[in-house]
Amino acid sequence: MATGTGKHKLLSTGPTEPWSIREKLCLASSVMRSGDQNWVSVSRAIKPFAEPGRPPDWFSQKHCASQYSELLETTETPKRKRGEKGEVVETVEDVIVRKLTAERVEELKKVIKETQERYRRLKRDAELIQAGHMDSRLDELCNDIAMKKKLEEEEAEVKRKATDAAYQARQAVKTPPRRLPTVMVRSPVDSASPGGDYPLGDLTPTTMEEATSGVTPGTLPSTPVTSFPGIPDTLPPGSAPLEAPMTPITDDSPQKKMLGQKATPPPSPLLSELLKKGSLLPTSPRLVNESEMPVPPGHLNSTGVLLEVGGVLPMIHGGEIQPTTSAVAASPAASGAPTLSRLLEAGPTQFTTPLPSFTTVASEPPVKLVPPPVESVSQATIVMMPALPAPSSAAAVSTSESGAPVSQPEPCVPLEAVGDPHTVTVSMDSNEISMIINSIKEECFRSGVAEAPGGSKAPSIDGKEDLDLAEKMDIAVSYTGEELDFETVGDIIAIIEDKVDDHPEVLDVAAVEAALSFCEENDDPQSLPGPWEHPIQQERDKPVPLPAPEMTVKQERLDFEESENKGLHDLVDIRDSGVEIKVEPTEPEPGMSGAEIVAGVGPVPSMEPPELRSQDSDEEPRSSAAGDIGEADGSSGKGDERPLSAVKTEASPESMLSPSHGSNLIEDPLEAETQHKFEMSDSLKEESGTIFGSQIKDAPGDDEEEDGVSEAASLEEPKEEDQGEGYLSEMDNEPPVSESDDGFSIHNATLQSHTLADSIPSSPASSQFSVCSEDQEAIQAQKIWKKAIMLVWRAAANHRYANVFLQPVTDDIAPGYHSIVQRPMDLSTIKKNIENGLIRSTAEFQRDIMLMFQNAVMYNSSDHDVYHMAVEMQRDVLEQIQQFLATQLIMQTSESGISAKSLRGRDSTRKQDASEKDSVPMGSPAFLLSLFDGGTRGRRCAIEADMKMKK
């Protein structure tokens, strides 16, 4: 909302027509799906839904963003409600879509009603006509229908032209440093050539019809207009009307034939900006005094001339021309030149440098001379338009019908069957520009200037210098984004490098700037036309080849554990003390289903390395704790093997993970540390093994201190030992199967290891714990856990892709979804289940989160947006859960040694334990992980509560 005002500034450059409700609904739905930051995707998705007759930039990214900001400003932000169970707060996107959907439904109902009325009316008319009652009015009806049709077509045409004109204007405004999207190349035809002598005589007037044909407001920017210096900018009172009688131009003019013979490409477009350099103007051969050109005064009347003054094309009477003005070439494309207005006002006396003289041919009497145009500097105009084609006869210039051949020192442009020999309309694209530039390269280095073909008597004056000067003055090229491509820019740069040596003064600033800005624009991803999903796609797909490192971690773990299983027995005993009997699966949890197979993402990769890392710093407390747990496990012969099953289970979460979504995981820093820590030296392995082994031997001496816990543990041991044996015997095979009663495969073993840490009491032995007058404490602990897990849920619900997973999927949104996905899951359902008590542990929460993402991955194809959203969001949410479990496990480890010793004095122990935890040594893994997790006290309390619940 805050950025809405900034976005509204975009409206000045975008289309101004109002959006239809249908278009707004498409926009809002696309934003709800792709998010309000991804305008590339939003724009691409709704392009097919534009109403007919819309301009090409209607659904541009800026226009979409601007329109959506308008929608946001006109929509009330929904107030956040608190405390209502299972209700997810509606977002602004939902409100907008709901409102527009209702409006669109009403609109469609209205359309249906109108269509039905029209149908009934037409049916009634048809029945009357068939019955013969309307015979007298048939002609009238036909005329009415024809008139209506004609009016509709005219309206559509006017609307289309207005839309095109507005689109062209926007395209021109988009590139303010450059000129209008018109390329004017003026090439002298008559007396403007420095090396040629032109016969002067009668003036042939031009037809005004030809001059004004096709001139509409939409085509004004691209209409070539001949501008006269010295002519007043306003219409004089006696100016000729548009209907002034004119003689049409003859198509077989010798000038045209001569132009056809000398059809070579125009001089380099790199010279256009030299109009701005006032120092070069005095020496220009363009500034020709009228006194040197004897024109019979009788031919100066009724000549139609088009003058461009701010886009208006008034008609100037020929008699208004002053005989002393200088004919200076000025094209609309050069309107940005600072010296142009001064040139128009300046008289010939201000230019002190002598000008090349243009004399008439002495051998022919002046009476016989065929007149050139009244403009002594008549030019052939090339109009290069990237977008709007102009009529071929859009400008009127008088032609010379002189039979005398004229020398043409400058290369001219081929005329391709154009009615007016002085106007050539060329539709520009990048190929033509590059062809012109190639020919320019050849032309620029010709040493001489073409000689007159016979009839011209005056020699060219210093051919090469004249060519340069003529190029400086004659060519005005405007560069637009549409004309430039990489090839063109390369050609321009090549010409620049070549020209620096020969004509350093001829370098064109505009061309260089155009080339540079084109290159800069193409560095900006927004301006490139190609689809921009691919880099994102590649980044998303980068994590895919990661299972290999995970498998190496697994293998190293297995080797490491085989080498020092006794030490790791105790390490895991420390972690899982007091609750290990829950491995016995005779009473599976009521909430668990087969979907749990994919639910467990082990936090253990981020757990074990800190333990190993800090072995040197806290070996003594741990070894004493190991002794205590050894007592709790009992002293039977197989007692050492049982914990190993838990070790092995925790040691291979990646092997469980890789079949379903292991390819989507990204190694976080802790996992990388895991890999390094498992490559520790053999000496450290042996040392830790001997320390833990010696502690186990000392353990059985304190059996007398144990209470009902050890008895309960020993009661349950035979089953668990058998299970551990079965697991150990198959440890080296690929997917080992545990002999569990509920039929889960080894993939569920990781889940069970998590259940050790945070599931509710479910086995008979653990029910003995709950008898110990802790019902009230368990309820309190459950409340605290619920608050803590809701923090994790809220982090997931605030994810940038969460709006896809917030609500249940309906068959309207995804056809056939419920036939493919047997157990749908979404964030609102998970929240409801937490509040209702259906989810009572972190493992169940993680299971349902995983289920939700796996449903999305299963249903959508791998190239679908929702698929990639699910993969990315799954990775982020699982990181949150892993951090939660990591802190939980470390705190459980630090607490378990004391709680296993004396359960009766647990209250005092817990207080003492809490104070110990608050003073964790700075080198310990618990301290590091608390830093990594933010180290908040509330999170710690929540995890303590989780552990209380399970006891």
Swiss-Prot record:
Report the GO molecular function annotations: nuclear thyroid hormone receptor binding; transcription coactivator activity
Q: Which residues does the record list as N6-acetyllysine (modified residue)?
A: 85, 554
Q: Sorted alphabetically, which PROSITE patterns does this protein's record hold?
A: BROMODOMAIN_2
Q: Which SMART domains did the record assign? A: BROMO
Its chief place of residence is nucleus
The covalent link annotated as Glycyl lysine isopeptide (Lys-Gly) (interchain with G-Cter in SUMO2) occurs at 542, 554, 582, 648, 685
Subcellular localization is given as: Nucleus
Ordered alphabetically, the record's keywords are: Acetylation, Bromodomain, Chromatin regulator, Coiled coil, Growth regulation, Isopeptide bond, Nucleus, Phosphoprotein, Transcription, Transcription regulation, Ubl conjugation
Q: Where is this cross-link: Glycyl lysine isopeptide (Lys-Gly) (interchain with G-Cter in SUMO1)?
A: 554
Positions of post-translational Phosphoserine modification: 456, 460, 652, 694, 710, 714
Disordered: region residues? 161-273, 520-547, 584-745, 900-922
> What is any one GO biological process for this UniProt entry?
positive regulation of double-strand break repair via homologous recombination
Task: List S-S links within the chain.
Answer: none
Task: Give residue spans, biased composition: Polar residues.
Answer: 204-226
Q: What residues does the Bromo domain cover? A: 779-884
Biased composition of type Basic and acidic residues is found at 610-622, 673-688, 904-919
Question: What are the GO cellular component annotations?
Answer: mitochondrion; NuA4 histone acetyltransferase complex; nucleosome; Swr1 complex
Coiled-coil ranges from the UniProt annotation = 97-171
Assembly notes: Component of the NuA4 histone acetyltransferase complex which contains the catalytic subunit KAT5/TIP60 and the subunits EP400, TRRAP/PAF400, BRD8/SMAP, EPC1, DMAP1/DNMAP1, RUVBL1/TIP49, RUVBL2, ING3, actin, ACTL6A/BAF53A, MORF4L1/MRG15, MORF4L2/MRGX, MRGBP, YEATS4/GAS41, VPS72/YL1 and MEAF6. Component of a NuA4-related complex which contains EP400, TRRAP/PAF400, SRCAP, BRD8/SMAP, EPC1, DMAP1/DNMAP1, RUVBL1/TIP49, RUVBL2, actin, ACTL6A/BAF53A, VPS72 and YEATS4/GAS41. BRD8 isoform 2 interacts with RXRA/NR2B1 and THRB/ERBA2. Component of a SWR1-like complex.
Name the PANTHER family on file: BROMODOMAIN-CONTAINING PROTEIN 8
What's its job? Answer: May act as a coactivator during transcriptional activation by hormone-activated nuclear receptors (NR). Stimulates transcriptional activation by AR/DHTR, ESR1/NR3A1, RXRA/NR2B1 and THRB/ERBA2. Component of the NuA4 histone acetyltransferase (HAT) complex which is involved in transcriptional activation of select genes principally by acetylation of nucleosomal histones H4 and H2A. This modification may both alter nucleosome - DNA interactions and promote interaction of the modified histones with other proteins which positively regulate transcription.
Q: Can you name this protein? A: Bromodomain-containing protein 8
